[in-house]
Amino acid sequence: KVVGRVAAIINRRANETWNKKEVRFGWIDFVDDPEVSKALLDQVEAWGKERGMEAMVGPLGFTDLDAEGMLVEGFDQLSTMSTIYNYPYYSQHMERLGFEKEADWVEFKLTVPDKLPEKFVRISEIILQKYKLKIKKLKRSEIKEKNYGQKIFDLINEAYAPLYGYSKMTQGQINQYIKTYLPLIDLRMVSLAADEAGELVAVGISMPSLSEALQKAKGKMLPFGWYHLLKALFFKKPKV
């Protein structure tokens, strides 16, 4: 019987960027047994030491688009599909093993009114005029024809650079993410901001929440899981 799993990762670009010698652990799951969690992380530590690493950090993935962090509160809240879920005992195991929190990831829930408050509209107009910005919607044809797929990920690389543990995505990774994610996004929920020269300076992407649909599907596409997902994506007023 499988009682735990973990991945050991050395992100050399991140280590070079942040001048670290760290081995990452990610995709960690274990039963509520201190011996199991210790055995998993002992293996990661040993593997990292063999390769010259001096510290262990996690949960982290290969890039910032992989799942990161560990849930420590809000267990009673319905999270987004991309949020890590783990049982409360996970963080207790980490603390017993000597791990300390190094960064916070915080998820917010905002209630969007049917009509935007006039104050928001007024401030938005002032900012657009002051910095000479233009807001546009992305068209499917522009992803390739005007290279907006590449521009969006170049912007993410630049904007995310100061974030904890970030390492810039390679061109190969960018190509894969463009192929994987952009066809799934409802472009009506994507907004772009460009400066006076037409250069992309900001992007905002919203997606319908699939959490309730995944619960109804019980995590499976068949026999009828696909129906709940399609309904959430295209036929139901979205919760974003």
What feature does the model see in each segment?
Residues 1-17, 137-240:
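A conserved beta-strand-loop-helix scaffold within acyl/acetyltransferase catalytic domains
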Residues 2-3, 46-53, 102-111, 130-135, ...:
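Short, mixed-charge, low-aromatic patches
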Residues 12, 62-66, 114, 210-212:
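Feature marks short, surface-exposed loop/turn motifs that line or immediately flank catalytic pockets
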Residues 17-103, 217-240:
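Acyl-donor binding region in acyl/amide transferases
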Residues 77, 122-123, 180-184:
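Short alpha-helix boundary/capping motifs
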Residues 84-165, 189, 202:
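Acyltransferase donor/substrate-recognition loop-hinge adjacent to the catalytic core
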